[in-house]
Curated annotation (Swiss-Prot):
It comes from the Bacteria. Residues 238-400 are annotated as: Catalytic. It is found in: Periplasm. SUPFAM superfamilies: Lysozyme-like. The active site is at 310, 335. One of its GO terms (cellular component) is periplasmic space. It holds the Pfam family Glucosaminidase. In the N-terminal section; belongs to the FlgJ family. The gene is flgJ. Keywords: Bacterial flagellum biogenesis, Cell wall biogenesis/degradation, Glycosidase, Hydrolase, Periplasm. One of its GO terms (biological process) is bacterial-type flagellum assembly. Residues 112-155, 204-229 are annotated as: Disordered. This is Peptidoglycan hydrolase FlgJ.
Length: 400
């Protein structure tokens, strides 16, 4: 082949024809392939491809109208396709296109300005900066003792941050303290999806209301995000086991206010999903919090943080809340009774303790829960427990 033909490839002007492959070759190997003008040419070529696909879709939509038309032949479609390809090239170059090329030019120009254009090796610069920090003779440093940690130093928070540095779950980062838990964190969490924290809780808790001993009402119907610990496992294998474990402890606490202990257990079952969604501490241990009581200003004991969804005026608001943590479930029952006795707004409920269903209704009226069916659900669970106990006393295993 004549060498003059080879030298002419990519050197001629842009013909503007879609069949001219030399103009595409010039974009790749031409003298100005790194120039600003070439960026616009590449953007226009991309826009022409987009326009061509758009024209194809428009043609295919009209094929149904061409059925039975003797001029709708394969030859006609071939020339029509050639026309559309040339039309897309001409529109992107001469008529200003649809603006897609202009957007690409702005984006590619910013990328080009931010890139290193001096041809220097970035790794060489790193090596120069790090040369003074590393010893030239590693064996000379082998005999030196490592620095001892400071006395009383607590690195647990830093370790938690390091442990949760890789996961992309923002909820887990907030629980580790990487993101502040103050009110700005709640605004940052607004971008999260409704179910973005659900994988951390295999069994969603029932609708409930958080409490605070300092008199500030907190909205219920929340769901809690916890650190990913032993998913799918529960402390209780069945509802019967939950009842058998909780009922003796609930009886001691119920005697203080004269209410039926079954209703306290039923309430704990509704709050925790039969023990499957009890709030956990950061180290994975159980908080034994059966009623979702928050710490409040008067609480000086241990606490467990959790990402909750509160409902304010019908709108879901995500926030990090601190909940009371107990050493046992029995302590949770007694603290719940003390909580009711220490708040005047629940006095009507305490006065109705002899009638457990009325007791739950008065709790709901006092703002204990936002769920309008809360008292009915607790009573239904309590009656179901009574049936289980009657069947067990008869020596017949309960159904289901």
């Amino acid at each position: 082949m004549d060498s003059r033909l080879l030298s002419g490839i990519g050197a001629g002007p842009d013909s503007g024809s879609y069949t001219d492959l030399n103009r595409l070759n010039q974009l790749k190997v031409g003298k100005d392939r790194d120039g600003e003008a070439n960026i616009r040419k590449v953007a226009q070529e991309f826009e022409s491809l987009f326009l061509n696909e758009m024209l194809k879709s428009m043609r295919s939509a009209n094929e149904a109208l061409g059925d039975g038309n003797f001029m709708n032949s394969q030859t006609t479609k071939q020339y029509q396709d050639m026309y559309d390809q040339q039309l897309s090239v001409s529109l992107s170059k001469n008529a200003g296109g649809i603006g897609l090329a202009d957007v690409l030019v702005r984006q590619l120009s910013k990328m080009k300005q931010g890139s290193r254009g001096n041809g220097e090796n970035p790794f060489a610069r790193v090596a120069e900066n790090g040369a003074g920090r590393w010893p030239s003779n590693p064996s000379a440093q082998a005999g030196k003792a490592l620095p001892m940690p400071e006395a009383g130093r607590d690195d647990s928070k830093l370790l938690n941050q390091r442990r949760l540095a890789l996961p992309g779950k923002l909820a887990e980062r907030m629980l580790a303290g990487i993101v502040p838990s103050a009110s700005p964190a709640a605004s940052q969490m607004q971008s999260l999806g409704q179910d973005s924290y659900l994988p951390a809780q295999s069994y969603p808790a029932a609708s409930r209301r958080g409490f605070s001993t300092d008199g500030v009402d907190s909205q219920g119907s929340r769901r809690i995000a916890q650190p990913p610990l032993a998913r799918g496992k529960s402390m209780f294998a069945s509802a019967d086991e939950f009842i058998a474990t909780m009922l003796p402890m609930a009886q001691k606490a119920a005697e203080r206010i004269g209410v039926d202990a079954r209703y306290l257990v039923a309430q704990a079952a509704l709050e925790t999903g039969w023990g499957k969604s009890i709030i956990r501490q950061q180290d994975g241990g159980s908080s034994h919090n059966l009623f979702g009581i928050k710490t409040g200003s008067r609480w000086d004991g241990a606490s467990a943080r959790a990402l909750t969804t509160e409902y304010e005026g019908g709108k879901a608001v995500k926030e990090i809340a601190a909940f009371r943590s107990y050493s046992s479930f029995e302590q949770s029952f007694h603290d719940y009774v003390s909580f009711l006795q220490g708040n005047d707004r629940y006095q009507n409920a305490l006065d109705s303790a002899a009638n457990p269903e009325r007791f739950m209704q008065e709790l709901q009226r006092a703002g204990y829960a936002t769920d309008p069916q809360y008292a009915r659900k607790v009573a239904q669970i309590a009656r179901q427990m009574q049936t289980y106990q009657a069947v067990a006393a008869a020596g017949t295993p309960p159904l289901g």
